[in-house]
Amino acid sequence: MAFGMLIYILLKAMGALSEEAALTASSLSTELWNSWTKNNTEAYYAEQPRLLKLMQTCLEEHHSYCINGLCAFHSELRKPICKCLAGYNGERCEHLTLNSYAHNSYERYIAVGIGIGILTSGILAIIYCYVRKRCRKLKSPYKVCMGETAL
């Protein structure tokens, strides 16, 4: 019963989050589109680069062409193109750009060297203590220990 309740709560939370994300993405795309195509007047186009002059809003049939971005119709190419949201790339903004972190190889070698040094020191210390303890047990006035002769 408790497990079923937990699953129910998790599913409700996931549903609420997905609805909120959909609302945020649609409002974000509207804001981006509005800032991208501010004005359609000739004066505005005269100040814009040539590429932006060739772009128009997508037709209704291409409305869902871009997966994670904004759709624009290129008049010379006569095909829809996408302006991807941050973190996405590809022709239809279908690929998520993953962050990669390269570790400096010298740091790794130093860490491995220190680890091996500590391990070797520990093993040598254990061997030294074992031999010394053994030598003390065997040492008597009449016995030889570690090459020493008795008095």
Swiss-Prot record:
Subcellular location: Membrane
Membrane topology, record value: Single-pass type I membrane protein
UniProt name for this protein: Epigen
Signal peptide boundaries: 1-18
Nuclease keyword on record: no
TM regions (residue ranges): 109-129
Key words, A-Z: Disulfide bond, EGF-like domain, Glycoprotein, Growth factor, Membrane, Signal, Transmembrane, Transmembrane helix
Cytoplasmic side: 130-151
Domain of life: Eukaryota
Organism the protein comes from: Gallus gallus
Residues in EGF-like domain copies: 54-94
Ranges per topology, Extracellular: 19-108
GO annotation (BP), single: positive regulation of mitotic nuclear division
Glycan-linked positions: 39
One Gene Ontology term of the molecular function aspect: epidermal growth factor receptor binding
Main location: membrane
Function description: Promotes the growth of epithelial cells.
Disulfide bonds: 58-71, 66-82, 84-93
Record carries keyword Disulfide bond: yes
Listed GO CC annotations: extracellular space; plasma membrane
